Amino acid sequence: MRTIAGLSPITAAQAAGPLETSWAWCTVRGDDGYLAAMGRVLGDGGWYFHIADVATDPAHQRRGLGRAVMEDLIFRIDDEAPPKPYITLLGDPPGRSLYRSLGFVDSEPSLGMRLPR
């Protein structure tokens, strides 16, 4: 799913276990089990929650699946976390309008950073 949706590729070793160690996750599957959309939440369970790996198969985009994944993840944070959680994500250009429509705002003057490996 990561590759076909345009996310950075990961190795099998990197893929072994992220769902089990995520605070929450959501998938949308077809009747045949085909993975059409996904997303997950990383967090400490108290205050900080980071939404990551939100992706939709291009063959299933523009059908509301990404929105459904995001709404489910946000609902779970709001429902299960203590009040006033700090929710972040890194919004790639294709998803920014969706994220903004869900209430996300730019975090300026903060800027997301990464450590290349």
Language-model region placement:
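A short helix-loop-beta-strand connector motif used in the catalytic cores of GNAT acetyltransferases and
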Residues: 16-27, 31, 83-85
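Short amphipathic alpha-helix that is part of the acyltransferase structural core
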Residues: 1-13, 110
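Residue-level recognition of the GNAT/N-acetyltransferase active site
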Residues: 57, 61, 92
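Conserved beta-strand in the GNAT
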Residues: 27, 34-43, 47-50, 55
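Short glycine/proline-centered loop/turn elements that form peptide/ligand docking sites
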Residues: 70, 93-94, 116-117
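Conserved acetyl-CoA pyrophosphate-binding loop and the N-cap/start of the following alpha-helix
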Residues: 60, 64-72
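Conserved catalytic-core motifs of GNAT/GCN5-like acyltransferases
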Residues: 84, 88-90, 100, 105-117
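Conserved GNAT acetyl-CoA-binding A-motif
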Residues: 70, 77-91
